[in-house]
Amino acid sequence: MANAISVGVAVQLVLTVLLASIPLRVIWNLFFHPLSYIPGPRLWIAFPIFRQIASIRGVFDAQMCEYHRKYGNAVRFSPNEVSFITEQAWRDIYDHRPNQLERFILSTTRRPDIFDANEIDHARYRKAMLPAFSPKGLQEQEPIVRGYIDTFIERLREVSATGESTDMVKWYNFTTFDIIGDLAFGESFGGLRNREYHFTISFTFEAFKLLSYLEAGAAYPLLLKILMAFTPQSLIEARDKKEEHAETTVRKRLDNRALHGRGDFMDYLLRNRGEKQGLNDKELVANASTLITAGSETTATILSGITYWLLQTPNVLQKVTEEVRSAFQSEADITFTSATSQLPYMLACFQEAFRHYPPVPTGMPRVTPSHGITKISGYDISPNTKVSVHQLAAYSHPDNFHRPREFVPERWLPDAKTNPSSPWYNDRRETVQPFNVGPRNCVGRNLAEQEIRVMLARVLWNFDLELAPESKNWTDQKTHFLWEKGALMCKLHDRFASK
């Protein structure tokens, strides 16, 4: 009996301590925490579960934009997370520095790819990949890319002939995934051929939506176990099928000697295979899969975004269309080189599109060292704090850009940068870094930029576009690390149809 009473008293004592610790923790986080001097939403700081709920609902990034407009350059949005929107923060968080801030990894088991790798392996993977994105590599890959863009234009011409509206998001995705699939695996996903998504691509879209749940699970392990218990078996099977497809396709590419020397990604990655600094077969599979995700969905996203904003800004659309059609004698003249050197206004349009609709709208967290204070954009940040530059908030903040809600490519032209009388002179253009900065910046930036420029230039060369009424508010989207894009319905008028 005495033992039973003792157990009961012990349980009550434990429960009392636990219940008492909640308000104490809230008070500590709000008023005594080393980061308490940085403003932010008190509800999220006191009860960080609400920050996770916002992510799961797909409204986190929109709310972060509001919080930065309310609180300023630095926002503390959970007990140990701080977001910034300044140029200096890009340098302090992501750039080369003596004590490099580590990338925050959701998974406890790192995949052997360039995203999840530690600093040593990341440098090794990057060294193996860089030649593929060099001028020589791009020159070898351009014929492959051009072939898919040719097919892309043919498909749009077929759709145009029907007189019906079409979803440009799908066509951009079909094309970019086919291109990157061929460059990484030696074969396309058949999107342009079959006019539908390959199962691995459909899984990729769904998988990004799960990142918010994984992030919540990292903060609340019990919640993760509950969520995993309710994960649909079909999703798990799709993941396994995707990984099996990647391994099988890479194996087939390795065995196909006819493709050796074609200058694609795998060709370059294989050059040091078996050597100490080279990639083993497991790393080849993981990095090929990563390149496909990173080099396709984001590329299609910016193409979709610039298409929408051009159609919403008729004077800009007219100006860039005239530039494209007057710069070349024929469509064949639109190449990687010419689309970059002869279309300055189109390049400015892309810069403005990246500002309005960055493919990765959120922040990419880094973790401050476990000892000492880290200075970020003038703020003293305590150890083990997750810090980031929130891209959408930074790019849309009035402190960084004059009339930020307007689509104005002129802010990126030389006159705006050098003429003090320009209304855009004081815009903080270095704040816009969609490809990141520092040692983990986008390794495929050169290819992505060339690809999107040629694709858009050829669309504008061939077609007059019209936004369908149902897509008028297309940018009203949720975000789950990437944008949850709906259909971008457009009507295409083939300017050569009657010729």
UniProtKB/Swiss-Prot annotation:
The keyword Metal-binding applies. It comes from Trichoderma arundinaceum. Pfam families: p450 (PF00067). Trichothecenes are sesquiterpenoid toxins that act by inhibiting protein biosynthesis. The biosynthesis of harzianum A begins with the cyclization of farnesyl diphosphate to trichodiene and is catalyzed by the trichodiene synthase TRI5. Trichodiene undergoes a series of oxygenations catalyzed by the cytochrome P450 monooxygenase TRI4. InterPro entries: Cyt_P450, Cyt_P450_CS, Cyt_P450_E_grp-I, Cyt_P450_sf, Cytochrome_P450_monoxygenase. It is found in: Membrane. The chain crosses the membrane at residues 7-29. CDD domains: CYP60B-like (cd11058). It is a single-pass membrane protein. The gene is TRI11. This is Trichothecene C-4 hydroxylase. Glycans are attached at N173, N287, N473. PROSITE patterns: CYTOCHROME_P450 (PS00086). One of its GO terms (cellular component) is membrane. Belongs to the cytochrome P450 family. Keywords: Glycoprotein, Heme, Iron, Membrane, Metal-binding, Monooxygenase, Oxidoreductase, Transmembrane, Transmembrane helix. Pathway: Sesquiterpene biosynthesis; trichothecene biosynthesis. Its main location: membrane.
